[in-house]
Amino acid sequence: MTAYRLTRRASLGLAAVPLLLPLARPARAQRLDRLVFQTDWRAQAEHGGYYQAVAAGLYRKAGIECEIRQGGPSLNIGQLLLTGRVDMTMSNSFEAFTYVREDAPFFTIGSIFQKDPQVLIGHPDTGFDGFEDLKGRTLLIGSGGRVTYWPYLRKKFGLRDEQLRPYTFNMAPFLADRNVVQQGFISSEPYSISKAIGRMPPYLLIADAGFSAYQTTIAISRKLAVEKRDLIQRFVDATLEGWAQYLKGGPATEAANALIKKANPEQTDDRIEYAIKVMNERGIVVSGDALQGGIGAMTDARWQGFYQSMVDVDVLPRGLDVARAYTLDFVNKGIGKPT
């Protein structure tokens, strides 16, 4: 795992393990193009559009047999892509630039999340209302966050490295000290903490500070994108339609959630319902570029702006060819655009 990877597993200091989601073959003899997509963590609502595309038959309608492999705490997803064991992975802006820096033959073809879903969570009734209120508090941030969004927040809000403490992947240190702020994901940790303290804690969405990373992106080899352009376009279109249906509660959403719960029994109906609700309310998927280009949209300007913001805080090196990190060929076609 590279220093610049910022996904759920990286923020926890973990890698990923492939857990296969078996998909039934169609009853009729039908030749389908097979693709393997690797997610960055265990099955959850934050991956719901992919499971919706399976449950609603969108991939099969597009002539694709899509195998979804869920992530977990063991293998390096980037290595799976590098060795050709998977066709595409769930990724992010940081990893795209890491591929450029290391001259690896991979790039980004779409971004499901317009807003990075990471949050900093405080305690109720402690004056924790904005990023300026981070000053003077103990911050539990993992290794991934320390080399990605932390330098950005530190510079913008005058914070200090002395405030940092290790994130131990459980709520106990946070619950024990009301002056502590901990990292999390908007669709998960605030919900878990609310169950422990009896009310929803205040939290700050890092994207609201101007941190403009694309998140939950689709990474692929340049070779596959060029040689099988039609196949990849069909995959992208079916995936984006899956996300549009999932967020609105399409007819196959219950079946999609059943697939999620089967793959990851830790997921419950109420947790999934909360995650979908907060993704919609906070515009995690449909906001920014997606308001005009549809779900998955990206722009040259945002890629360039994010890169420059990371250069300014010494997170990424100067001189990278930003255009090699991504292509706009497969997105910005209006799928899932608000009407």
Task: Go through each PLM region and give its residues.
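Short, glycine-/small- and polar/acidic-enriched structural segments
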Residues: 29-187, 205-206, 212
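Conserved C-terminal helix/tail region of periplasmic/extracytoplasmic solute-binding proteins
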Residues: 300-339
